[in-house]
Amino acid sequence: MPRSALSVISFCHRLGKQERKRSFMGNSSNSWSHTPFPKLELGLGSRPTAPREPPACSICLERPREPISLDCGHDFCPRCFSTHRVPGCGPPCCPECRKTCKRRKGLRGLGERMRLLPQRPLPAAALQETCAVRAEPLLLVRINASGGLILRMGAINRCLKHPLARDTPVCLLAVLGGPHSGKTFLLNHLLQGLPGLASGEGSWPRSAGSGQGFRWGANGLSRGIWMWSHPFLLGKEGRKVAVFLVDTGDVMSPELSRETRTRLCALTSMLSSYQILTASQELKDTDLEHLETFVHVAEVMGRHYGMVPIQHLDLLVRDSSHPSKAWQGHVGDVIQKSSGKYPKVQGLLQGRRARCYLLPAPGRRWASRGHGSSGDDDAGRLRAYVADVLSAAPQHAKSRCPGYWSEGRPAARGDRRLLTGQQLAQEVKNLSGWMGRTGPSCASPDEMAAQLHDLRTVEAAKKEFEEYVRQQDAATKRIFSALRVLPDTMRNLLSAQKDTLLARHGATLLCTGREQTLEALEAELQAEAKAFMDSYTVRFCGHLAAVGGAVGAGLMGLAGGVVGAGMAAAALAAEAGMVAAGAAVGATGAAVVGGGVGAGLAATVGCMEKEEDERVQEGDREPLLQEE
């Protein structure tokens, strides 16, 4: 086909795709040049770009899935390339420009090469800019109308499995307090100071409002535990910690039942590593009572999950009547008030894990910033406290400490293992699974401790029985080892081990429903023993059949050889061919009989003689084995 004709055809295809009702005429000068591939830029831009579409065919303008690309820059679909290609041409010839050029791989080969490129970690600033999408408070634990708790694992995974927190140690700043204690107002100021500190600027935002974060007032965030969906990376390079803000909601509300409040304290202790308790004017008896419950529950959870119960606690008191009062004196007053009545709080305040701050009341002075020197001074105090909290947050990442309670003393810093966001999400899931199985008797920290103790006891009994079954399975893998232990004997061994475990671990249970717990444990152990016995019985029968077949075939094969040799010696007068045939048939027949008897021995060991007689009678059909 002439070159001009091909150019006209390609030109018609192009214009016909855009305007099918327009008539035209062209020549070789009207051929379009294909746009070259854009340069591949690896990096993260400020705006997300749409995915690039595959190149269009130069003839039909379709976008094939696997285009044929040539070095000249033109692309074709397989159908057009095979139709308009010049026949008999060795190297590929472009149907568009008639140049002889090599063929390039399509987009599939390009994608494979891009996957083989070395992956470079993105800068923290760029990654944080990308991840800062739709940051909002998320409800993690909801309190329904009946007072029950609903754990939203989807929201927890969205926060803790964030790209910045999935494989990074996490610090959870949780603010506790009763109604109208300035809790939400403090969260907003913490939220304002975090972006500047995370970006390295360290500057306070110029806007002095409460921010667009946690809402303030009666219609704000309540009835559950909330968390800011976006973490902030703080700390030195190489030791970054993902910091989250947590609003505990109504965890200290007197309207909740004791059971709901105890469970909320357990979830709060799991979802916090730096607690701030806010109180108006002074710590009341109700605040100390709720704090005593929280510390007790945190110790119970720490003992069960191997975590440091209270890593750091701030007592933030709004004392508008005595703004210059020393915080040491206030802590002394609190310790004296809690003496004997709140031992957990007293022990916490006497240690190094708690400190006290006195700030002006939020309703009067913080809102008057810019209208006098006193307002500026009070706002400076708030900023100083917020900066102090955020600078100390990376040092209080959520920590796991296995030897904390076993040795009876705080472990060293090097003994702790910092939990990442993904690990903490798994621990929260385990806690929710236990709470879903427990009964209504969890109205106090002591009852929760008893239930967790029984849970550890049951798990220990299960693991011990599983280990015993594994040992028996490993000891009976070989044939002769398995034949020494009959299935009935193995069943008796498992039953005795189960009774021993139930008697030993059942005596250590603490909850009132001890019988129900033992019945459930016995059912699980019996199910595991039955599953093992089913597989062991099949294995034992297989080993017995193999040994019986081998022994029977060997013994009867030897007997058949002896009988054949004797008959050959008795038939010396016969012809040589008849003697050889007799010996061969005798040996073969006896071997067959032996194999049959061996199989019978494996199936029914007690009836070996009867099965042997039947097999021999079947073999008497052979002429040379007939009896006189």
From Swiss-Prot:
It is an enzyme of class 2 (transferase). SUPFAM superfamilies: P-loop containing nucleoside triphosphate hydrolases (SSF52540), RING/U-box (SSF57850). Pfam families: GBP, zf-C3HC4. InterPro entries: G_GB1_RHD3_dom, Guanylate-bd_N, P-loop_NTPase, Znf_C3HC4_RING-type, Znf_RING, Znf_RING/FYVE/PHD. One of its GO terms (molecular function) is GTPase activity. Gene3D superfamilies: P-loop containing nucleotide triphosphate hydrolases (3.40.50.300), Zinc/RING finger domain, C3HC4 (zinc finger) (3.30.40.10). Keywords: Cell projection, Cytoplasm, Cytoplasmic vesicle, Endosome, GTP-binding, Membrane, Metal-binding, Neurogenesis, Nucleotide-binding, Nucleus, Synapse, Transferase, Transmembrane, Transmembrane helix, Ubl conjugation, Ubl conjugation pathway, Zinc, Zinc-finger. One of its GO terms (cellular component) is cell body. It catalyses: S-ubiquitinyl-[E2 ubiquitin-conjugating enzyme]-L-cysteine + [acceptor protein]-L-lysine = [E2 ubiquitin-conjugating enzyme]-L-cysteine + N(6)-ubiquitinyl-[acceptor protein]-L-lysine. Residues 167-409 form the GB1/RHD3-type G domain. Its EC number is 2.3.2.27. The chain crosses the membrane at residues 544-564, 577-597. Belongs to the TRAFAC class dynamin-like GTPase superfamily. GB1/RHD3 GTPase family. GB1 subfamily. E3 ubiquitin-protein ligase that plays an important role in neuronal differentiation, including neurogenesis and gliogenesis, during brain development. During embryonic development initiates neuronal differentiation by inducing cell cycle arrest at the G0/G1 phase through up-regulation of cell-cycle regulatory proteins. Plays a role not only in the fetal period during the development of the nervous system, but also in the adult brain, where it is involved in the maintenance of neural functions and protection of the nervous tissue cells from oxidative stress-induced damage. Self-associates. Interacts with SP1 in an oxidative stress-regulated manner. Interacts with SIGMAR1 in an oxidative stress-regulated manner. Interacts with ZBTB16 (via C2H2-type zinc finger domains 1 and 2). This is RING finger protein 112.
